[in-house]
Amino acid sequence: MLKLIMSNFWKNEVPKGYYDTSILFDKKSKRNIQSNWHKKTFSAVNSYIKDDDIVLDFACGSGTFLGKYVKNSNSIGVDISKNQINYASEKYGNFGSFFYLENFSFEEYENHFDKITCLGLFEFITTDEAEDYLEKFKYCLKEDGRLILTTPNFVILMNIIEFILSKFGKLNYSNQYKVKYNSNFLNSTIKKNGLFVCKIEKIISSFIFLSLLIGKTALKLDKIYGKLFNNKFGLIILAEIKK
């Protein structure tokens, strides 16, 4: 397997527990853009997962998805950052097992997982690395299992948003991107590795940014927009993939 090469940004510069503490569940959270963005993504991904599914959450960060959404405590989270894995183990250790990437062996999990989730990773790794991990995911999935993958939909609007976030966001990701996918490019990458795309949908509209001003109403507008256009337009690509 190729050794995953990622910058020091992911290992040490992202604060411990950053993504988990950015996701809020109180009344004020309806007006928090970042929190709403992540919760909409997690909810969309979780709609593909059954309560008894054993899940591998690859690039799990600080463990929020397993800790807040996945029901089966036999699930596993893996990440390249020791800081995030330590945080996840401390906070969500009762909801799953968490491993630093160098301590996780794919070979021990042949045909093991009902679902594998990989959320927001592929844009930060090379296509060679992506293809290598797709092969590993295929090995670890049960015969009827599914890989659920998300990545930004890098069309004009998303590129503009990323530019703005690089200037005004809490973290600047602009130097971390290695590949910018659209749905066609992602589809071809997946098929190239002997996997099959069951479904591609695009989630999260620009209405999400209005949540700062109109809170819950913005989330309703985002939901209506998705239904109206059957999730054919959105800032995030969500792919359901099988062997």
Positions of the model-derived regions?
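Helix-to-beta-strand junctions that scaffold the AdoMet/dcAdoMet cofactor pocket
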Residues: 50, 125-126, 141-143
